[in-house]
């Protein structure tokens, strides 16, 4: 069974007034989509873990701990980290932590929660 870590932004800490985000987006919508994605991945035979980052976090030592505590085959970095300008530094930090603590894991990007499994299949 392939082990995958999904890294995303904690929806409870997102500033939904940010004009980069869709106007109707809410934390409930993100949470529902994330749960559905993880359930789909688990049903497809992946062992998935979720790691959420609070907006504005600069200390990613907990992420480093997660990556050293379990050997992951792949790490998915969600579009909420990559695609929102305010999270750009966080994105760089995440990539460097993954590169340092999970050297053998494939780094995977999705464009939407609904294409996460397709994104994983490209690499695993």
PLM region spans:
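Ser/Thr/Gly-rich flexible loops in soluble cytosolic domains mediating phosphotransfer, phosphorylation
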Residues: 33, 90-124
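Mid-chain, well-packed structural core segment of small domains
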Residues: 61-97
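A generic structural motif
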Residues: 42-48
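Short, well-ordered secondary-structure micro-motifs
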Residues: 16-18, 61, 120
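N-terminal, charge-rich interaction modules
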Residues: 1-20
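Short catalytic helix/loop segments, enriched in acidic residues and glycine
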Residues: 22-39
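Short beta->alpha junction loops
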Residues: 49-58, 110-113
């Amino acid at each position: 069974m392939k082990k995958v870590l999904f890294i995303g932004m904690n929806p409870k800490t997102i500033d939904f007034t940010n004009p980069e985000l869709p106007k109707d987006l809410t934390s409930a919508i993100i949470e529902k989509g994330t749960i559905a994605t993880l359930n789909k991945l688990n049903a497809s035979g992946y062992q998935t873990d979720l790691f959420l980052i609070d907006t504005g976090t600069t200390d990613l030592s907990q992420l480093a701990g997660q990556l050293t505590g379990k050997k992951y085959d792949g790490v998915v970095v969600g579009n909420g980290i990559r695609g929102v300008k305010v999270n750009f530094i966080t994105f760089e930090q995440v990539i460097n932590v993954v590169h340092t603590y999970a050297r053998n894991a494939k780094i995977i990007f999705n464009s939407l929660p609904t294409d996460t499994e397709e994104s994983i299949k490209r690499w695993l």
